[in-house]
Amino acid sequence: MTSEIKKVGVIGAGTMGAGIAGQLANAGVEVVLLDLLNKETGNNRADEAIERMKNAKPTDAFNAGLMIPDNAKNITTGLSNENLDMLADCDWIIETILAPQEIRAGIYQNIEKIAKPDAIFSSNTST
């Protein structure tokens, strides 16, 4: 049995997480992108990542992600330490954060509490 991936949650808006979110948005998939506040700017890192992708040149491999800046409309942002509930209706949840295993384990436990039973969970980091 196959199921369609309609909504994907990405935790971590660094190079990998933002790039994954951008490519999914390019494909027309609804994306929730979560990260923490940037201590230097006070902005959500996920919002900053979207702005970088919208302004990136197609040849900029480290900031690429959105083929058309308007595809950013497919991405909703939130804070990973406050808005994990935004992942509750995601079909696929991808963790891409660089953090010690203990921190990621805590996030996994919290996701398990709110994720739908048939959600796919994957990690883009060493777990």
Placement of each model-derived feature along the sequence:
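Rossmann-like NAD(P)-binding element
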Residues: L36-E48, R52-F121
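NAD(P)+-binding Rossmann beta1-loop-alpha1 motif at the extreme N-terminus of oxidoreductases
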Residues: M1-N55
